[in-house]
A protein has these predicted regions:
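DNA-dependent DNA polymerase catalytic subunits
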Residues: 2-43, 48-344
Length: 344
């Protein structure tokens, strides 16, 4: 709303002007230098970082000390902003997030602290962890990676966790229940032949007329290999029971490309330079920085620039982290062997 936007602009201006380049006195840590910066605002929330420094040395303040100072200054800033608002309007301190990952508008994750800097819980919004059309294995894998990043901030450990998860998937050790997706069947589809679980319900009805799922029933299905690449979704899914009875092959590549990959591309794309650093690919980092400068010079609209950057980073992450597993699945399906097999 217009009022919400005005409040965000007001809070941004107040905090950045008052704490933008200021030495502040704190209760437990004496004087600290603030370089407050607006991060994100939406409807009735606004996010800032204080970019804390030692006022004498200029050294950045991080970790637990930064968390404690931020909680104190954020409450102070909220009270200051409220003084100049007409009641009942107020700017209320809600939470401090450390670490904090902002993926896009209304999509973020972080360790949430309120007033106690020693009591934090993981908070996420708008992520695939909550989507009903996500299988449990995505939630397990994504959640495990986020847990590593939130608690240890170790990107290499997060990548190793991803690799182990992908290996477990393609080796067939993931329980089918973890790959199943459940959707409710309705009776009012405009184009029912394009609705995968409706087509599956029809197939079940033909196989067993007395047990055709009815509108309102929740249908559980798993994706299976179909050699026809143009096949519609209804011909790519089956019930877990039918898969076991007929020894069908689960389509693991679908779970990588359509379930795991997209949300994880976006997440790891934010750490692309760190990944290249671990792999000692300095040339890739130089090329990336050059490409980003060129992109920034050709696109003036910030939102469009961020979308193009995300697309660029996602493609690089696919190559770095996912392609070797997709190739392995393809080889197993076609009977091809890698050249290393001949020297094993």
């Amino acid at each position: 709303t217009a009022t919400g936007r005005m409040m965000i602009i007001y809070a941004k201006r107040m905090v950045e002007e008052v704490y933008g380049d200021r030495v502040c006195k704190t209760k437990d840590y004496g004087l600290v230098k603030c370089r407050a910066e607006y991060i994100y605002g939406d409807t009735d929330s606004v996010f800032f970082t204080f970019n804390l420094e030692d006022p004498e040395t200029g050294e950045k303040i991080r970790g637990q000390k930064a968390l404690e100072i931020t909680i104190e200054l954020a409450q102070e800033a909220a009270n200051l902003c409220t003084q100049f608002l007409k009641a009942p309007q107020c700017l209320e301190y809600e939470k401090t997030l450390m670490p904090f990952i902002l993926l896009s508008k209304k999509r973020y994750v972080g360790m949430l602290y309120e007033e106690d800097p020693h009591k934090g819980d993981m908070k996420y919004m708008g992520l695939s962890l909550k989507r009903r059309d996500s299988c449990d294995y995505l939630k397990d894998t994504y959640g495990g990676i986020l847990n590593i990043l939130m608690k240890s901030d170790n990107i290499q450990d997060a990548i190793e966790y991803l690799y182990q998860s992908l290996n477990n998937l393609i080796e067939g050790t993931v329980p089918m229940e973890k790959l199943a997706i459940t959707k409710a069947l309705r009776s009012d589809y405009k184009n029912p032949m394009q609705i995968g679980h409706w087509v599956l319900a029809e197939k079940i009805g033909k196989r067993d007329p007395g047990n055709r799922p009815k509108p309102g029933d929740r249908m559980k299905f798993v994706f299976v290999v179909n050699k026809d690449k143009k096949a519609l979704m209804g011909n790519k899914i089956e019930t877990p029971e039918y898969i076991v009875q007929n020894n069908l092959t689960i389509d693991y590549s679908h779970y990588i490309t359509n379930q795991l990959m997209k949300p994880l591309q976006q997440l790891f794309g934010l750490a692309l330079e760190h990944i290249w650093s671990y792999q000692k690919k300095t040339g890739a980092i130089k090329t990336f920085k050059k490409d980003m400068v060129n992109l920034e010079n050709t696109i003036s609209d910030m939102e469009l620039f961020m979308k193009r950057k995300e697309k660029y980073c996602s493609a690089k992450v696919k190559t770095l982290l996912f392609d070797k597993f997709l190739t392995k699945i393809q080889h197993s399906q076609t009977g091809m062997q890698t050249i290393t097999k001949f020297f094993a």
